[in-house]
Amino acid sequence: MTPAPTAKGTTLQVRRTIPASREAVFRAWTDPDVVRQWFGARGGSTLHADMDVRVGGRYRLDMESSMGTGSIFGEYLEVTPPERLVYTFRWDRVPVAIPDTQVTVEFLELEAATEVVITHERQPSRAVSEFHAWGWDGSLEKLAALFGNAKEAAGDG
């Protein structure tokens, strides 16, 4: 996946059609037991998920991959079931001087599926944006497989 170009080159958008209801996909995104089954880039896994899914609530996901272990964490800014999540996103290995990035996840209802649209903003560089695009693409591939279909939707970029 290639990040969508922007004025600063630090925002990416990833889309995937998931063969499940919007409610089921939203739950897969907000239930720690389900998140552990799919979240993380190809070849990686989520070992632990602690999530307080409410405005002002915090989350932490501990992950493992061929690059080692790491955690992401942040705060929920908007929770609108089953339509939208907005939250801050930070890696534990990132210096404090770099501001949090922000993720918006939209769950768009289709006839027999849900289109998930992830917009990841405020990234410090194009390279970081490309790394996150790779990670989101792998995560969404695993989420689609969880529901029985790993094919990308037409027009994914």
Describe the predicted segments one by one:
Residues M1-K8, L146-G157:
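Basic/polar N-terminal segments that are highly enriched at the extreme N-terminus
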Residues R16, A49, I72-E78, T101-L108:
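Hydrophobic/aromatic beta-strand elements that line small-molecule binding cavities or substrate pockets
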Residues V25, V35, Y59, Y76, ...:
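Hydrophobic pocket/interface hotspot
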Residues S66-I72, A97-D100:
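Short coil-to-beta-strand transition motifs
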Residues V86-G138:
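Beta-strand/loop substructures that line and gate deep hydrophobic ligand-binding cavities in soluble
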